[in-house]
Each structure stands twice: as structure tokens, then as C-alpha cells.
């Protein structure tokens, strides 16, 4: 039977009639039922380890040269928050590093905030910061 079909496909066979018996409706229905059950089982697979083991880290930096900005950016790419203290740098170099880090934070959809004189906090997108240092100082002054 199969050789006849193959021969007809390539135009070699002499007999153009089909020798197979047609399927009945009962045979066709029996074949379709097991396939539907298999598809339902595949949709029920769920991973349960997705949130296990996640830790957050904050890295402290006190850069002295512009090339230290690359290390800060690498930590942001690794989903670590970074606190940067520019107290030991001149203002021009510090401004260049802040510009570089701001670009990195923008590309990652993170945030950068000034938290003090020459101190900045840069966070990747999974971190959430609340409040401002200036607001906290004002509240403390009102309480005193």
C-alpha cells in the first residue's frame, strides 16, 4: 500500500485507484480524544523556584578617578544599589562620573538621588526608595 502511494506520488505506479478503505467516523473520533488530553496536561506546568534565593546588596564607593565609574556601572548592571561619596574628588571629575552613572541608570530604568553633599544613591529598577533626606532633616528639626 505505501509503495503504491509513493509510486503514484512520483508518477511511477500504474494503478491510479486507492486501495485503502476509508475511515469511519468512529475511528476518527477515537484518535482525536487522546490528543486533547495531552494538550491539557502541558499547560499545567508551573515553576515554583522563581522567587527563592533573591538577595539585595548595596555597594559603597568613594571614587578617586574617572575610571572608577565603570565599576559603579557594573554593580548597577548586576542589580546592586550603589552609594557614591565624592568627598575626595574635585567637582569637575565628580560631575563627569555623575553624568556617566545617570546614563547607566536611565538605560536600566533605575533611579539616582542626591542624598547629601557630594553623596548620591543609584539604584537598579528592582529597588524602591521612599522619602528624601531633606524631608527627614526638616522633620527632625521640627521635633527638636
From Swiss-Prot:
InterPro entries: Cell_div_SepF, Cell_div_SepF/SepF-rel, SepF-like_sf. One of its GO terms (biological process) is FtsZ-dependent cytokinesis. Transmembrane segments: none annotated. Residues 16-42 are annotated as: Disordered. Keywords: Cell cycle, Cell division, Cytoplasm, Septation. It is found in: Cytoplasm. Its main location: cytoplasm. GO terms for cellular component: cytoplasm. Belongs to the SepF family. Homodimer. Interacts with FtsZ. Cell division protein that is part of the divisome complex and is recruited early to the Z-ring. Probably stimulates Z-ring formation, perhaps through the cross-linking of FtsZ protofilaments. Its function overlaps with FtsA. This is Cell division protein SepF. The lineage of its organism: Bacteria, Bacillati, Bacillota, Bacilli, Lactobacillales. The gene is sepF.
